[in-house]
Design a protein with these regions (language model features):
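C-terminal motif of bacterial Sec signal peptides marking the signal peptidase cleavage site
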Residues: 3-5
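Bacterial signal peptide processing site
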Residues: 7-9
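Secretory pathway targeting signatures of secreted, lumenal, and periplasmic proteins
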Residues: 18-73
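Surface-exposed amphipathic alpha-helical segments
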Residues: 22-25, 134-169
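Second-shell loop/turn segments in exported
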Residues: 60-69, 96-98, 143-148
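Signature of long, low-cysteine stretches enriched in small and polar/charged residues
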Residues: 73-128
Length: 169
């Protein structure tokens, strides 16, 4: 497992967190402030860690989060955003509960859905607000066997997640 420290600057929003990239997994570059990693490709399994500004509205609902928002309220915004996404079909929320993420109060969602290409995903979605940012850590995999096969690997990534102190460059 390699520890990846992410700090980003320039014209894009800065983000700052650390997470372990499992051995045998690769990261995929993105213009967005996020870390995307997969072992067998995004249509098999992936882990996505993202930081977004609280001021940035979500794409489909145009709703934003705010400082002091309860984790349950933030979770509801995420569920409504997913339900509004035209690329998501057959969405079913299996669980919505409180969670601790790197020492922060947040939430965990477990859900299944079909994407626009017909792939069925099962997802664990963790989220929390810290300062002016919303952080989410998502694990998704197609088919139950892929989900179970890499669940322990995701748990190691999740446990390795910390907010960093690196300066944007």
């Amino acid at each position: 497992i390699a520890l990846l420290s992410c700090a980003h600057g320039g014209g894009k929003p800065a983000f700052n967190f650390n997470a372990a990239v499992p051995e045998g997994w690769k990261t995929i570059d993105s213009e967005d402030p996020m870390l995307f990693m997969t072992k067998d490709g995004g249509y098999k399994q992936f882990v996505l860690i993202r930081e977004r500004s609280l001021a940035e509205p979500f794409q489909f609902t145009q709703r934003s989060m705010r400082k002091g928002m309860l984790p349950e309220e933030a979770a509801d915004i995420i569920v409504n955003e997913i339900l509004s996404d035209t690329n998501v079909r057959n969405f079913s929320l299996l669980e919505k509960t409180s969670a601790r993420i790197a020492g922060h109060s947040g939430f965990r969602l477990t859900f299944i859905y079909t994407d626009a290409d017909g792939f069925n995903f099962k997802t664990l979605y963790y989220g929390f607000i810290n300062g002016d940012s919303f952080y989410n850590i998502r694990y998704a995999a197609t088919q139950e066997d892929y989900f179970q096969q890499d669940l322990k690997t995701f748990e190691k990534v999740f446990e390795s997640f910390t907010l960093g102190t690196a300066k944007a460059s």
